[in-house]
């Protein structure tokens, strides 16, 4: 049985939206570089220099003899760095990077990025830029099927998204608990509804996604479980949720991310499940990569957040992350 509880909009009305990146072009049709700064926190961190950087741009042919052919729109998550430089100067250096892109495959299709340009202001992000990085292609590229193998490719940075990490403490991405199941437990999930205003202008390139007025995604927070064999009632779980004093915001981790902060009292069991942290981050890059790509340059705002209380999936139910399901005869083996 599923029970749904609506949060009051005051829980996200301050930081629950992201401004769009409106594409503008030069006279020759090239996109004008832009930077967007997002601050989803409450501003209680003493040192305000920590930030997460996310680059957006065009994957194009690296041909010095003619105008480059744009293949797809792509992104490069650089991660967290510490810098006092102005966003505009960081953007300028990013647009001067010579980032090579290569298409390859592992468990799934991958994109390999590595930079050949010396770093100055972007030195805090040298781990990704100088040693190279490999990403799931569908997470960082709008149309990986259009990227050729016989023509050298480069990633030309056009947009930069900076997320200031102004909350005190650590940001937890509770990956270990997302598949946790327990007997006689109630799963606490969130259903988030976003209103989307897609940024489309004269600089529009390959993009197969369609404009959606609203979109939803779901995240798992944790489980409410009693020590005995009984199960908590939905009303009791709702009371525990209300006591948590949850505040929501949108950030730019991995593209678009949901940030949650508990300002109230959290149950000891749930607090332990979340690594004893009260500041959580759920990147859409991991949760819903298709929606995340749609939101790369879009204006979006939270219009509804609902707590969804469901019975925890029984432990005997197997989770199949692969399309191959072994039969009892062992006729199909996975190496």
Curated annotation (Swiss-Prot):
Paired cysteines (S-S): none
UniProt xrefs under InterPro entries: Matrix_C (IPR042539), Matrix_N (IPR042540), Matrix_Paramyxo_C (IPR055413), Matrix_Paramyxo_N (IPR000982)
Keywords, sorted A to Z: Host cell membrane, Host membrane, Host-virus interaction, Lipid-binding, Membrane, Viral envelope protein, Viral matrix protein, Virion
Keyword check for Nucleus: no
GO biological process, one term: virion assembly
Gene3D superfamilies: Viral matrix protein, C-terminal domain, Viral matrix protein, N-terminal domain
Subcellular compartments: Virion; Host cell membrane
Molecular function in Gene Ontology: lipid binding; structural constituent of virion
Keyword hit for Phosphoprotein: no
GO CC, alphabetical: host cell plasma membrane; membrane; viral envelope; viral nucleocapsid
Quaternary state and interactors: Homodimer. Dimerization is critical for virion formation. Interacts with host ANP32B.
Family recorded in the similarity comment: Belongs to the morbillivirus/respirovirus/rubulavirus M protein family.
Function (record text): The M protein has a crucial role in virus assembly and interacts with the RNP complex as well as with the viral membrane. Associates with phosphatidylserine (PS) and phosphatidylinositol 4,5-bisphosphate (PIP2) at the plasma membrane. Interaction with PIP2 triggers matrix protein lattice polymerization. Matrix proteins induce host membrane deformation and curvature necessary for virion assembly/budding.
Protein name per UniProt: Matrix protein
Species name: Measles virus (strain Edmonston)
